[in-house]
Curated annotation (Swiss-Prot):
One of its GO terms (molecular function) is dephospho-CoA kinase activity. The keyword Transmembrane helix does not apply. The keyword Hydrolase does not apply. Belongs to the CoaE family. It holds the Pfam family CoaE. Gene3D superfamilies: P-loop containing nucleotide triphosphate hydrolases. Catalyzes the phosphorylation of the 3'-hydroxyl group of dephosphocoenzyme A to form coenzyme A. It comes from Chlamydia felis (strain Fe/C-56) (Chlamydophila felis). GO terms for biological process: coenzyme A biosynthetic process. This is Dephospho-CoA kinase. NCBIfam families: dephospho-CoA kinase. Pathway: Cofactor biosynthesis; coenzyme A biosynthesis; CoA from (R)-pantothenate: step 5/5.
């Protein structure tokens, strides 16, 4: 049995998941991001890349790379297409996270393994983790963060949010809930408390 506590951070769009992960990493945890993992293996000439092109069309490739803006425009107002894309990507993302956990645990260098997985519950992946941390923020706060960061419209925010299950449902299952309607410094203090509590959990 591997003795490294395996923790997932999840939450709605622009709730502050990535910022919380950054704090955990600053404190010494190993952090992996599902979004970054998918970006790393999604290349046009790979097996998965060919499947994505077959699904979405060759126009998603620009200058020999996937154009993520074009992909987003195709899938975020088409739930069937979005779910088909996720069915291609998510199994590989989960496989890589599991593989990385085994490698990191054997190194025995880190106090915690943290995986940022936005759709943790939606893809039925929560049972693979020892603890789940849910980052929450109210809708107006999240919308303002999203539009400020991306320059996208409110409509785009709501289209992307449609893929997430309700926050109330996730709150019923999460082990730890961190409210993030305040400043980054306030979030840091909360994350620090849980870091030290989790560090001593095994």
């Amino acid at each position: 049995m591997l003795d490294l506590l395996k923790v997932s951070i999840t939450g709605d769009l622009s709730s502050g998941k990535t910022e919380a992960c950054r704090v955990f990493q600053d404190l010494g945890a190993y952090v992996i991001s599902a979004d970054k993992v998918s970006h790393s293996f999604l290349v046009p000439h790979s097996h998965i890349g060919h499947r994505v092109i077959d699904l979405l069309g060759s126009d998603v490739v620009v200058d020999n790379a996937f154009d993520r803006k074009v992909i987003a425009e195709k899938v975020f107002d088409n739930l069937v297409l979005l779910q088909a894309l996720e069915a291609i990507l998510h199994p590989e993302v989960c496989r890589i996270i599991e593989e990385q956990y085994c490698l990191v645990a054997k190194e025995n260098k880190y106090p915690l393994f943290i995986a940022e997985v936005p759709l943790l519950y939606e893809i039925q992946y929560a049972n693979k983790f020892d603890r789940v941390i849910l980052i929450t923020a109210d809708e107006n706060t999240r919308r303002e963060r999203f539009t400020r960061k991306t320059n996208c419209s409110d409509l785009n925010f709501y289209q992307r949010c449609a893929r997430f299950s309700s926050n109330e449902e996730k709150m019923m299952h999460a082990d730890i809930i961190i409210e993030n309607n305040g400043t980054k410094e306030e979030l840091r203090h909360k994350v620090e408390e849980y870091f030290y509590a989790l560090k001593g959990a095994l």
